[in-house]
Amino acid sequence: MKINILTLFPEMFDIFKHSIIGRARENGFLHIETINIRDYTLNKHKKVDDYPYGGGAGMVMTPQPVVDAIKAVKEKNKGKVIFLGPRGKTFNQEMAKELSKEEELVFVCGHYEGIDQRVYKYFDLEISLGDFVLTGGEMACIPVIDSISRLVPGVLGSEESFQDESYYDGTLEYPQYTRPFEFEGEKVPEVLMSGHHENIRKWRRKQSLLITKERRPDMFEKIKLSKEDIKLLKSK
C-alpha cells in the first residue's frame, strides 16, 4: 500500500519508522511519504494561514497551498483523499478493513481552526476519531494509518494476529495471560493450561462475549449470536 500524508508537521510521522510499521516499510509492504503543505504556498513568507472572514478566534488554513499539494500528489497517487476532521464519519474497525483493501491513500491533516471550506470538494472522505478536540489532524491521522496499515497483507506476518483482536469480529478481545502461572495469588485459568484447543476456543469466545456485553452493550446488540454463542452465555 502507498500512503501520502499532507501535513504542516512531517516530523510528527517519524513514529512510522519504528516497530511493526517500520519493518513493513523496510520489507516493501508499505510505502509512506509525508509532504509538507508549506512547500506549496505561493506566499513569500511561507504563510499557510490567515484570519477567518466574519471574525472569530484563531487562524484558518488558506486554500491555495492545500489544493496545490493535493493536485501534485494526485499526479502520482490516485487513491482516495481523506481529511481528518470533526465533521467526518466516526472511524471504526470496519472502516479500517475497507480502507486496507485500497492500493493507495492520501491523507490531509488540518491545523489551527480548520481549512478553508473551498478545499473540501477535493476530499473523497472525511474521518473523525470521535466527539473530542485535538490540536491538529496529525494526532488523528497517526492512529488511523496505524489501524489501516496493520491489516494490509504481510504487515503483521499472519492474519491470525489480528483476527482474534478486539473489534475484528464485533467483540472485545478475551483476557490474555503469560508466565508466571501464579502472580500475586492469582492463577492463570486452568483451561488455558489444558492443551485442549477446542475448550480453549470456547472459553475465549465466551469471555469475549461477556466482556463485550458488560463494557460495550451497544456493540453486543449488533452481534448475530450463533447457537453456540447462546449456549456459552448460558453455561457456568
From Swiss-Prot:
Its main location: cytoplasm. GO terms for cellular component: cytosol. HAMAP family: TrmD. The keyword tRNA processing applies. Gene3D superfamilies: 3.40.1280.10, tRNA(m1g37)methyltransferase, domain 2 (1.10.1270.20). One of its GO terms (molecular function) is tRNA (guanine(37)-N1)-methyltransferase activity. It catalyses: guanosine(37) in tRNA + S-adenosyl-L-methionine = N(1)-methylguanosine(37) in tRNA + S-adenosyl-L-homocysteine + H(+). Belongs to the RNA methyltransferase TrmD family. It comes from Clostridium perfringens (strain 13 / Type A). Transmembrane segments: none annotated. It comes from the Bacteria. Keywords: Cytoplasm, Methyltransferase, S-adenosyl-L-methionine, Transferase, tRNA processing. Specifically methylates guanosine-37 in various tRNAs. It is an enzyme of class 2 (transferase). This is tRNA (guanine-N(1)-)-methyltransferase. S-adenosyl-L-methionine binds at residues 110, 129-134. Signal peptide: none annotated. It holds the Pfam family tRNA_m1G_MT. One of its GO terms (biological process) is tRNA N1-guanine methylation. It is found in: Cytoplasm. InterPro entries: Alpha/beta_knot_MTases, tRNA_m1G_MeTrfase_C_sf, tRNA_m1G_MeTrfase_TrmD, tRNA_m1G_MTases_N, tRNA_MeTrfase_TRMD/TRM10. Its EC number is 2.1.1.228. Homodimer.
